[in-house]
A protein has these predicted regions:
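Surface-exposed coil loops of outer-membrane beta-barrel proteins
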Residues: 1-69, 98-125, 247, 254
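Basic phosphate/pyrophosphate-binding loop/patch that engages nucleotide-derived ligands
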Residues: 71-73
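Outer-membrane beta-barrel pore domains
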Residues: 78-88, 94-257
């Protein structure tokens, strides 16, 4: 899906923050698309990561991506969309999915030590660094101004130093109501939950609730306000995430072209 915020390109994200496991990567590749009578399909192949090296070409193999789905207006007021996608890399020196980001997290410096400077604040990186397969299912239903969007996601993989695969799951559901002239105003809520196994076998989970509202001042200018509450469970007592939580209000304005 393309619902995440990327720098000032936040028009498609009704909330300030992205998902806890943020599915973002930059890779060079090609894709082939098919569309007919509401059905859609895509297959693609990439170079596996952006910053390649000629010194050890055997470290990274191509990544495979694919998507299938159905998207159609069932009536004048009802739109239905259901898609499933997969990303697979058999071998890479450093997987960017869930780990890389050009913009950084919107919850700046939360759950970080004083001297910390991570761009992943408030996010979870499953650390499936060298081998990964990720599946995602996205249902979307819109009836008049009311819309539902969901995420069912599972990522499995490991670091090169590990012998067994680890699995991470992500679930999210959001409900948005758009109103006003040309639906230029909206209110909504999102629940996001992630659980999985860290390197070393520790089972953890993170939950987040977001409540927000937005105003499209023009089609290119969006202002948002959001309340967020996030909690961490099961983390090592020696880490800052042990029994961690944060909450607060974020205000954001963006101009996107």
């Amino acid at each position: 899906h393309f619902r995440r915020t990327d720098n000032a390109q936040s028009i498609h994200n009704p909330f300030v923050g992205n998902y806890i496991m943020d599915s973002f990567t930059t890779e060079v590749g090609g894709e082939v698309y098919f569309r007919k009578n509401g059905f859609l399909g895509m297959v693609g192949l990439t170079n596996g990561k952006l910053n390649q090296s000629v010194e050890n070409p055997g470290k990274t193999s191509p990544s495979f991506v694919a998507k299938v789905g159905y998207d159609n207006n069932l009536s004048e007021d009802l739109r239905f969309r259901l898609t499933g996608s997969v990303y697979h890399t058999n071998q890479t020196s450093s997987a960017y999915l869930y780990a890389g980001d050009r913009a950084g997290a919107r919850y700046y410096s939360v759950m970080e030590p004083v001297e910390g400077g991570s761009f992943r604040s408030g996010r979870m990186n499953p650390n499936l660094r060298n081998e990964m397969t990720s599946f995602m299912i996205n249902p979307f239903v819109k009836y008049k101004g009311l819309e539902f969007f969901g995420v069912l996601e599972q990522a499995t993989g490991k670091r090169a130093s590990e012998t067994e695969n680890r699995t991470w799951n992500q679930y999210a559901a959001e409900l948005i109501y758009r109103f006003g002239y040309d639906e230029n105003l909206y209110v909504g809520g999102r629940y996001n939950y992630v659980d999985g196994e860290e390197v070393g076998g520790n089972n953890v989970d993170v939950s987040r609730f977001q409540l927000g509202a937005g105003w499209f001042m023009t089609k290119n200018i969006l202002t948002k306000i959001e309340y967020v509450n996030q909690e961490y469970n099961g983390f090592n007592p020696q880490t800052i995430l042990d029994q961690g939580k944060f909450n607060g209000v974020m205000v954001e304005a963006a101009i996107s072209f």
